[in-house]
Amino acid sequence: MSQISAKDVKDLRDTTGVGMMDCKKALEETGGDMQKAVEYLRKKGAALAAKRAEKDASEGMICIKVAEDRKAGVILELNCETDFVARGEVFTGFAGALGQLALEGSAASAGALLGMTLSAEFGGEKVEDAIKTMTGKLGEKIELKRLVFCDAADGLVEAYVHPGAQLGAIIHIASAQPDSARELARDLAMQVAAAAPIVVDRSAVPEELIAKESDIYRQQALGQGKKEEFVDRIVQGRIEKYYQEVVLTEQAFIKVNNMKVSDVLGEFRKQHEAAVEIREFVRYQLGE
């Protein structure tokens, strides 16, 4: 067996990010051949990934990347097994690299990102293989759970990530005054993260959902002994309250409690003589 030098071990560690003892073992198993040692470690990572496939990866982080010109953005959730790994530089750096690759490559889905190729910093591997390599490096199951790419060629994207990176939101708006609307867009992204709306406006609430909620409220009212002639009014009142909870434009604005989001949009229109249209938003909370 050829002599394995400390420099070779260090070089392999610098290349792969794997621990010193594992690097030494890889070099010993491959007769000191650096390329074969790298491949050995990749295979080891793939084997560990297969072994840990059934493990529960419920920790991790929400990563958001937005283009400098605000014309595109991406939000993704990357999972691991423990909070300790989720907070580490290796994991967060990997999540950031995936987010940047998804942004630059306009990845339409998590599946599309898995087929893209990372930079040399991550071995020039496809994301699918790099996740296996990262599993071997960190000793935990790593999983790309979900991803949404937002194309805002007709407007701009803003985002908010809550401290701890377990909650985040991205929003796409359109306005004839995009520069003036950026601060409002950031506030709206924070609104989405904090208040968890499900649709932009009332018209987007599925009819079957309203029918379901109405039936629940009706049964509750009857169960409380309310008279039949008052039940419809009670149900309608509760449905209005439901709209205020789940419709973004009807929610109380988190920065000014006596104003709705729709009021804030109206104030912007008056001040800037330009409307702001909310095109779409995505909210991710870790583990949902």
From Swiss-Prot:
Keyword Cytoplasm in the entry? The reply is yes
Keyword Cytoplasm found: yes
Q: Which Pfam families match?
A: EF_TS
Gene3D superfamilies with a match to the protein in the record: 1.10.286.20, DNA helicase RuvA subunit, C-terminal domain, Elongation factor Ts, dimerisation domain
- Quote the InterPro entries the UniProt record gives: EF-Ts_dimer_sf, Transl_elong_EFTs/EF1B, Transl_elong_EFTs/EF1B_dimer, Transl_elong_Ts_CS, UBA-like_sf
**What are the start and end residues of every segment in region (Involved in Mg(2+) ion dislocation from EF-Tu)?**
82-85
| Principal location | cytoplasm
Where found in the cell?
Answer: Cytoplasm
The GO molecular function terms of this record are: translation elongation factor activity
Q: Which UniProt keywords apply?
A: Cytoplasm, Elongation factor, Protein biosynthesis
Q: Which PROSITE patterns match?
A: EF_TS_1 (PS01126), EF_TS_2 (PS01127)
Q: Which residues cross the membrane?
A: none
Q: Report one GO cellular component.
A: cytoplasm
The record's function comment reads:
Associates with the EF-Tu.GDP complex and induces the exchange of GDP to GTP. It remains bound to the aminoacyl-tRNA.EF-Tu.GTP complex up to the GTP hydrolysis stage on the ribosome.
Q: PANTHER family of this UniProt entry?
A: ELONGATION FACTOR TS (PTHR11741), ELONGATION FACTOR TS, MITOCHONDRIAL (PTHR11741:SF0)
Q: What family, per the record?
A: Belongs to the EF-Ts family.
Q: Which NCBIfam families does the entry link to?
A: tsf (TIGR00116)
Q: What is this protein called?
A: Elongation factor Ts
This protein's encoding gene: tsf
